[in-house]
Amino acid sequence: MAPKIAIVYYSMYGHIKKMADAELKGIQEAGGDAKLFQVAETLPQEVLDKMYAPPKDSSVPVLEDPAVLEEFDGILFGIPTRYGNFPAQFKTFWDKTGKQWQQGAFWGKYAGVFVSTGTLGGGQETTAITSMSTLVDHGFIYVPLGYKTAFSMLANLDEVHGGSPWGAGTFSAGDGSRQPSELELNIAQAQGKAFYEAVAKAHQ
């Protein structure tokens, strides 16, 4: 039976949503499929308006109950970094997972991450590394992007791009004006494909 994959993300300005769509495309390229979820917004609309945040994609369900993820075999987490860590919206979600932590409900499931940062030194690798403490506490098995399927893209020095062996990544610029490049989306697609293939192989 094919593994069940979820892609869980938070995206204020749409960068991580575009990366999530690319990850999904890669999973589908590998012959699988995935369910997209977004974590709940915690900022009031008045604040979001002042930040010029566009409306969220209403076609993607909001993940209110962490128990929903118990039915999935692998989960990709899309994280827009806040000081090299999860943003508050994601932290609020994780704070709801006490029951799953206590019961080991996520133990043995597979996880990967992809990120967005405002600047080159903004935490492309640090955000992924910081997420490990949460994933390890829950017993997730981390599946990195690595270099095997994306070496030429990750090693491309012809243009500025996000991404690392920890996972795909994009730069948004400090004001959110930069959108994911074709190269960054291709890296995300490669990650989705490789992640699904790895989970499917282990799931046999």
From Swiss-Prot:
InterPro entries named among the record's database cross-references: Flavodoxin/NO_synth, Flavoprotein-like_sf, Flavoprotein_WrbA-like, FMN_Rdtase-like_dom
Superkingdom in the source lineage: Eukaryota
Entry GO terms, CC: cytoplasm; membrane
GO molecular function list: FMN binding; NAD(P)H dehydrogenase (quinone) activity
PROSITE patterns linked: FLAVODOXIN_LIKE
Entry coiled-coil feature ranges: none
Database matches in Pfam families: FMN_red
Domain Flavodoxin-like: 5-195
Subcellular location: Cytoplasm
Cytoplasm among keywords: yes
Location (main, coarse): cytoplasm
Keywords (A to Z) from UniProt: Allergen, Cytoplasm
SUPFAM superfamilies documented for this protein: Flavoproteins
Family of the protein in this entry: Belongs to the WrbA family.
Alphabetized NCBIfam families for the sequence: flav_wrbA, PRK03767.1
PANTHER family: FLAVODOXIN-RELATED PROTEIN WRBA-RELATED (PTHR30546), FLAVOPROTEIN-LIKE PROTEIN YCP4-RELATED (PTHR30546:SF23)
Annotated protein name in UniProt: Minor allergen Alt a 7
Lineage, opening ranks: Eukaryota, Fungi, Dikarya, Ascomycota, Pezizomycotina
